[in-house]
């Protein structure tokens, strides 16, 4: 579950690399600003346009998952007749029910396709909402990464200097890890605190 929230490992038919690439662009940009240099990645300048696209790609994943989960929670609490009309959705309301909602959208957005069996998800709401999440989380990142690649391909080659942050350095690895932790991992911490962590502590 935690890996699906971050989506930064290689695999998943290229999706792990695709999202890791967005985090690297953000890490390079922030690192360049910290030392007062124009950010460079693979000997090409990284400017505002690339950063904006990478930010959209990185933030889209938690956005669609958390919005979907919030919508499901809202309907579960404030539209019980709608939920009952679809079979009631969950057998275990509370911490575990929220975990099931969260996992359903996380799985849809992260090339997984699995789900908790306690959630009755073969309904109109779940099929359509998860389909929308799936489409957004697949195609927008692909379009964004291709756009970044096109922008970088059109830029002049810049020779490396002593001030260039090399992508095979420990500093770059640490910066990329920090970006992934802050942008991806912490985005999900509040909802996990109310679901999976709360359920674990209550056992």
Where are these regions (language model features)?
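Short, small-residue-biased leader/transition segments that mark boundaries at the very start
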Residues: 1-6
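Hydrophobic alpha-helical bundle architecture
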Residues: 7-16, 28-59, 73-94, 104-139, ...
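Hydrophobic mid-bilayer segments of alpha-helices in multi-pass membrane transport proteins
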Residues: 19-26
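Lipid-exposed faces of alpha-helical membrane segments in multi-pass integral membrane proteins
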Residues: 22, 56, 60-67, 129-132, ...
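Conserved catalytic alpha/beta cores of large enzymes that bind or transform nucleotide phosphates
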Residues: 26, 115, 181-184
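Final/C-terminal transmembrane alpha-helix of multipass membrane proteins
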Residues: 62-63, 171-193
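Short, hydrophobic/aliphatic alpha-helical segments
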Residues: 96-102, 176
